């Protein structure tokens, strides 16, 4: 396969992913907005705590699903983690999404594959080149 073929295949896959995201939003909730980084978000609760920034240690509880409606993780099963924002402990898309929240906030984020788990998936539930949907249920800043 030539470099040109690979580039064309990636372009086609990216267009298909955009179409699938647009269809999901049209069917489920048209209040999502697109971020400058090209993921989609809906802030459900602003939160009253501190604005989050890179370097903050946070504890998050989330549901992680796919566009087909399947749920991969819940707080009871791998959907609860402590991370440092800016280190990409989970993935770049979620890392950037968390910067949109305040402590105590809640939001839903549709993260395209290239900002989520990419070509390799997460080696568990999320397959290769899959768009993921994070529903952040709670986020709290951890003060060392």
Question: Model-predicted segments: where are they?
Answer:
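Cross-family detector of peptidyl-prolyl cis-trans isomerase
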Residues: 1-144
């Amino acid at each position: 396969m030539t470099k040109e073929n690979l580039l064309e295949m990636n372009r086609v896959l990216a267009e298909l992913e955009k179409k699938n995201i647009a269809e999901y939003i049209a069917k489920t909730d048209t209040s999502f907005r697109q971020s400058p980084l090209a993921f989609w978000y809906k802030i459900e609760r602003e939160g009253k705590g501190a604005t989050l920034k890179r370097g903050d240690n946070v504890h998050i509880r989330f549901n992680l699903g796919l566009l087909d409606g399947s749920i991969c993780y819940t707080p009871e099963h791998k959907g609860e983690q402590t991370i440092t924002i800016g280190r990409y402990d989970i993935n770049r898309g979620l890392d950037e999404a968390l910067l949109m929240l305040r402590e105590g906030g809640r939001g839903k984020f549709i993260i395209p594959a290239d900002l989520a788990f990419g070509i390799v998936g997460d080696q568990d539930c999320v397959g290769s080149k899959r768009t993921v949907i994070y529903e952040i249920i709670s986020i709290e800043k951890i003060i060392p």
